[in-house]
């Protein structure tokens, strides 16, 4: 058997239909696009238009609002902190806070604060300062001999008292 003997199975590759090549082809003149007008032209369709039927975005009611005072916490799991400690990017002896996590590369940014979650295990005795923590995360850190201190979220300067 040679490389030139290898071929596709019969019917595996269908030939492309050449449109606009005479009425005898069955795909001449309008090339299967129907009559004239907007739908015969190329380009972007009208977003959300459903052919005159009431579109989905108008059929469904408005719901909810965006709370401008909502705080956006970055979540980090215990296994990620343990990985950073094992890789010598975090010092288990010093306090682990948002600044230390960003500096070590465990987090990209701290946003409005950090929330500790309990996925994975932590074996190092660590002192963690975060803005929020799950019960399982606190229990796991304390089981390893460490502590979790919860901080108040940082308030904006322009916020009313």
From Swiss-Prot:
Coiled coil: none
Keyword RNA-binding (UniProt): yes
Pfam hit, one: Ribosomal_L27A
Gene Ontology process terms (BP): translation
Biased composition (Gly residues): 21-37
GO cellular component: cytosolic large ribosomal subunit
Keywords of the record: Ribonucleoprotein, Ribosomal protein, RNA-binding, rRNA-binding
Chain residue ranges for the region called Disordered: 1-43
GO molecular function, a single term: rRNA binding
PANTHER family per UniProt: 50S RIBOSOMAL PROTEIN L15, LARGE RIBOSOMAL SUBUNIT PROTEIN UL15M
Protein family membership: Belongs to the universal ribosomal protein uL15 family.
NCBIfam families xrefs: rplO_bact
Function as written in the Swiss-Prot or TrEMBL entry: Binds to the 23S rRNA.
Complexes and interactors: Part of the 50S ribosomal subunit.
This protein's name: Large ribosomal subunit protein uL15
Species for this entry: Bradyrhizobium sp. (strain BTAi1 / ATCC BAA-1182)
The encoding gene: rplO
């Amino acid at each position: 058997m040679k490389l030139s003997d290898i071929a596709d199975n019969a019917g595996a590759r269908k030939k492309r239909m050449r449109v606009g090549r005479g009425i005898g082809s069955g795909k001449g003149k309008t090339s299967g696009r129907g009559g004239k007008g907007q739908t015969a032209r190329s380009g972007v369709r009208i977003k959300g238009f459903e052919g005159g039927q009431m579109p989905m975005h108008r059929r469904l009611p408005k719901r909810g609002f965006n709370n401008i005072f909502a705080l956006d916490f970055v979540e980090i799991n215990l296994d990620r902190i343990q990985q950073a400690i094992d890789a010598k990017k975090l010092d288990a002896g010093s306090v682990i806070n948002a600044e230390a996590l960003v500096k070590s590369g465990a987090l990209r940014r701290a946003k409005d604060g950090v929330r500790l979650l309990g996925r994975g295990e932590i074996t190092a005795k660590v002192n963690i300062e975060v803005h929020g923590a799950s019960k399982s995360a606190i229990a796991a850190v304390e089981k390893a001999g460490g502590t979790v201190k919860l901080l108040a979220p940082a308030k904006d300067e322009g916020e009313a008292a």
